[in-house]
Amino acid sequence: MISNIFIFIICYLFISLSVIGYGLIFFSFNKNLKISLNFGYAGLTGLLMLCIYSYFSSFFYEHGSTHNLILIFIGFAYFVFFNLKKIDYHFKVISLFLLIYFVGILIYKSHDDFPYYHFQYTYYLTQMPSVIGIGNFNLGFRTPSSIFYLNSLFYLPIIKFYMFQMAAFLIFLYSNVILISKLIQDNINKKYNFLTFYYLLSFIFINIFFSRVSEHGTDRSAQILILILIGEILSFVNFKVKIEKHLSKLFLLIALIISLKAFYVLYIIFFSIILYKLVNSYK
């Protein structure tokens, strides 16, 4: 029992830090791509990178345990390399949240859709390449989501499929890191405005109503990201910000939200607000 929990903790840290590592790898390509020092945004960026990779790679080969182990190790190694010579404020924040939120991944009962098609879809991606027409076997297979493809990358040796809720948990974790980092930064700078209260209320709301990760399907993860997206849009519209980096944050959040469930493409309306702001800024 103790050995199983120890293995679970190791995999939990291994995956969580590896995803951040992939976000940092993306940031390292060009300084203009570094949208934030916040490890929460690095984590979300890493999720998007892995999501894109998993979609394309699934057509050519299965996401087996050996493949996934190598993939996750690369991200983890970069994260360790990145933080080898410095332990800054952002590292302390992510370490604290990893410690506090560990209990969130200890799931006793999953939500109703998980045994219906979430598990089957994810597990099938680990056993064979993606096949066109699989939706004829189960209606659930006709509604793909990035969360299934992400979870298929967390199928590792020994732990096997017991990390198939990890993608939803990571969105929950990184979103909380983003919110609390913004609150801490406002407190350090002694600059309080309506967004400070918005982020505080969002943090409280997420941790009360979305605290049960076992109930997270594709909807709730997207709803958490929508709360952050609204905050970033309000910041973009009402305050002077670096347009390029802020736009990158908005595109990142919108891309993740739409990838989780197709009907969230309706949130494309937010682009009209962004374009309106851009037009006015260049007048």
Locate each region found by the language model.
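Transmembrane signal-anchor helices characteristic of membrane glycosylation enzymes that use polyprenol
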Residues: 11, 78, 90-113, 204-207
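Membrane-embedded, hydrophobic transmembrane alpha-helices
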Residues: 1-87
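Membrane-interface transmembrane helices that cradle and orient dolichyl/undecaprenyl
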Residues: 188-190, 226-246
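Active-site lumenal/periplasmic loops and adjacent helix-entry segments of GT-C-fold
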Residues: 102-195, 213-215
